[in-house]
Amino acid sequence: MISSNLDWLRIVGLAIGLCSLAFTSCNYDVPITPSPTRNIEKRLLGDLISLDHKENMKVRPLDDNTYIVYYDGDLFRAYHSDVAGTPFATIQDLNSNDRKYAYVVWKLSDDGKHLSLRNVSDKVISKEIKDSGTVVALLTKNASKPELFGEEIEFKKEK
């Protein structure tokens, strides 16, 4: 019984860690692209909750090209940084002094009710890169490789 309880706690811990990973792992010094590659997508706006009901996210427009994301007490700025036909987003932590970036790929279900996020692995795209051009080149080169992405985190729309 103890073993199964420990396994359960590990699974819960992993799930919580993965939900936090997409936004709290802002490790990069530069954005994917220095500016948005397209306007915001209105279907992404709204209140979302993780499938385990432990993580909340609110996505609002800042302007025509940029989102403000409220994620469990923290604020982030996000915009589309599409590369190689892949819907990447550049996410900047607005709460920290260093204002670092996270890179994610996103997918919205056809009905607009489910959003999945996968962070870009810093094992493929090094945290040491200091220019957006190199980031774009590496994302283009590795876009079809599964090891580019971390675990998928899913949210559903509340309203």
Please identify what each model-predicted range represents.
Residues 22-25:
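C-terminal motif of bacterial Sec signal peptides marking the signal peptidase cleavage site
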Residues 27-44, 51-159:
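Calycin-type beta-barrel ligand-binding domains and close structural analogs
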